[in-house]
UniProtKB/Swiss-Prot annotation:
Name of the encoding gene: MTG2
Protein name, UniProt field: Mitochondrial ribosome-associated GTPase 2
Species name: Pongo abelii
Keyword DNA-binding found: no
Cofactor: Mg(2+)
Domain Obg: 70-224
Entry annotated with the keyword Translocase: no
Binding site for GTP: 231-238, 256-260, 278-281, 345-348, 371-373
Record text on subunit structure and interactions: Associates with the mitochondrial ribosome large subunit; the association occurs in a GTP-dependent manner.
Alphabetized InterPro entries for the sequence: G_OBG, GTP-bd, GTP-bd_Obg/CgtA, GTP1_OBG_dom, GTP1_OBG_dom_sf, OBG_GTPase, P-loop_NTPase, Small_GTP-bd
Keyword annotations of the record: GTP-binding, Magnesium, Membrane, Metal-binding, Mitochondrion, Mitochondrion inner membrane, Nucleotide-binding, Ribosome biogenesis, Translation regulation
Length: 406
């Protein structure tokens, strides 16, 4: 037997070894893997723009625009089939010394429905398969046992999903928990007990279950967000979204860098979150589906208020606002009249300074001048964004509706 003092000495040696190993391991860690108390000084920043981003330790690398096109899907063609009904049973009661017990075949169970449900945690149609088959009902049994009905199959889709059949809109799942029965399950078959009659005391007839309903549905996603950034290609919308949130859309010096909508979350005190959508750049004639205009414009329909992003370095920048409002109005009447703010981006460029006064004179309203690249005047945008959100919330509550919570 090992003496107690020897055991405690060995235990002390083991703990000391573990302590030396932990210190040496932390010393060899890269800066990106440091513990929270060793994080970079940027995490301690108290500026308004930095507080709008939720501070997190570096993790996985952001998805590139090419990979994002695989993960973000805004259209699906789905074949949905309801569950088949179970077959009825044809049998007779069997009991000792009772030769003619009568029919006791039970009915089959009903097939399960296929239901689409709007889920707040789902942001894309990428998880939706191209075919769904509902659960079938069980067959009936003897002793008047009915078959169990098939379970309901739920398909989770993001909020803002339009369900179309043959070019006709059959459902609009715009709220959390909205459901739509995509395919009905088949009815269960009848057992021979169902056909018992005065003129037929021993029926042997039973019916099979009915097949489930089959439908081809087209799912279209319209991005649901509080604010939607609208502008021409290369206006700096993606750079602006990166500056005020943790979203990481692709940024490059050529137009049409963004091909799919991005949604960034701006954080405020009191755990308030405002969702801002970066809509791909639209061009003149977008309402006629030029440059995939219809595919881009439909993501603006669900935005509660708009942010018109103008490239201040371009000649006559006020024409950009007029053209954007015209395209929105031609696409959907009243869309351009929603609450909005005008953002003049790229003020850090020399040619932008000369256009600023002309822009204000032509528009005759407040213009938020900033630079997404340098972060100049981002605080004014964040404060004005909060004002637009408060006005939207007050209007929704005044009409007895709950505002959108992200």
């Amino acid at each position: 037997m090992t003496p107690a003092r020897h055991f405690s000495a060995r235990l002390r040696t083991v703990f000391e070894g573990v302590g030396h190993w932990a210190l040496s391991t932390q010393a060899g860690l890269k800066p990106s893997r440091l513990l929270p108390q060793q994080a970079s000084p940027r995490l301690l920043s108290v500026s308004c723009a930095d507080l709008a981003k939720r501070q997190e330790l570096p993790g996985k690398k952001p998805l590139s625009e090419k990979k994002l096109k695989r993960y973000f899907v805004d259209y699906r063609r789905v074949l949905v089939c309801g569950g088949n009904g179970g077959a009825g049973a044809s049998c007779f009661h069997s009991e000792p010394r009772k030769e003619f017990g009568g029919p006791d075949g039970g009915d089959g169970g009903n097939g399960g429905h296929v239901i689409l449900r709007a889920d707040q945690q789902v942001k894309s149609l990428s998880s939706v398969l191209s075919r769904y088959q509902g659960f079938s009902g069980e067959d009936g049994g003897s002793k008047n046992c009915f078959g169990r009905s098939g379970a309901v199959l739920y398909i989770r889709v993001p909020m803002g999903t339009l369900v179309k059949e043959g070019g006709r809109v059959v459902a609009d799942l715009s709220r959390v928990g909205d459901e739509y029965i995509a395919a009905l399950g088949g009815a269960g078959g009848k057992g021979n007990r169902f056909f018992l009659a005065n003129n037929n005391r021993a029926p042997v007839t039973c019916t099979p279950g009915q097949p489930g309903q089959q439908r081809v549905l087209h799912l279209e996603l319209k991005t649901v967000a509080h604010a939607g950034m609208v502008g021409f290609p290369n206006a700096g919308k993606s750079s602006l979204l990166r500056a005020i949130s943790n979203a990481r859309p692709a940024v490059a010096s050529y137009p049409f860098t963004t091909l799919k909508p991005h949604v960034g979350i701006v954080h405020y005190e009191g755990h308030l979150q405002i969702a801002v959508a970066d809509i791909p750049g639209i061009i003149r004639g977008a309402h006629q589906n030029r440059g995939l205009g219809s595919a881009f414009l439909r993501h603006i329909e669900r935005c509660r208020f708009l942010l018109f992003v103008v490239d201040l370095s371009q000649p006559e920048p006020w024409t950009q606002v007029d053209d954007l409002k015209y395209e929105l109005e031609m696409y959907e009447k009243g869309l351009s009249e929603r609450p909005h703010a005008i953002i003049a981006n790229k003020i850090d460029l020399p040619e932008a300074q000369a256009n600023l006064s002309q822009l204000r004179d032509h528009l005759g309203q407040e213009v938020i001048v900033l630079s997404a690249l340098t972060g100049e005047n981002l605080e004014q945008l964040l404060l004005h964004l909060k004002v637009l959100y408060d006005a939207y919330t007050e209007a929704e509550l005044g009409q007895g509706r709950q505002p959108l919570r992200w």
